[in-house]
């Protein structure tokens, strides 16, 4: 049986923690930030941990990063 391929789009957008959780950058910070509140800009910096339902989908795309 051939090896499963990792989705290139997933490996660029997500990373795994040592405990198996999935980290991602929050959406909504590419452009149009001039009209956003300072609180919104502050909240979307850094990374966030995905919910269990979303993490399950992402882990299918990254079979060797568990």
UniProtKB/Swiss-Prot annotation:
Keywords: Ribonucleoprotein, Ribosomal protein. One of its GO terms (biological process) is translation. One of its GO terms (molecular function) is structural constituent of ribosome. One of its GO terms (cellular component) is cytosolic large ribosomal subunit. The keyword Repeat does not apply. The keyword Nucleotidyltransferase does not apply. Residues 1-14 have a biased composition (Basic residues). Residues 1-34 are annotated as: Disordered. HAMAP family: Ribosomal_bL35 (MF_00514). Belongs to the bacterial ribosomal protein bL35 family. This is Large ribosomal subunit protein bL35. It comes from Paracoccus denitrificans (strain Pd 1222).
């Amino acid at each position: 049986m051939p090896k499963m391929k990792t989705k290139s789009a997933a490996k660029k957008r997500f990373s795994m923690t040592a405990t198996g959780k999935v980290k991602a950058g929050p959406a909504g910070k590419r452009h149009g930030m001039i009209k956003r509140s300072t609180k919104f800009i502050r909240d979307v910096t850094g990374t966030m941990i995905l919910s269990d339902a979303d993490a399950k989908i992402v882990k299918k795309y990254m079979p060797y990063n568990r």
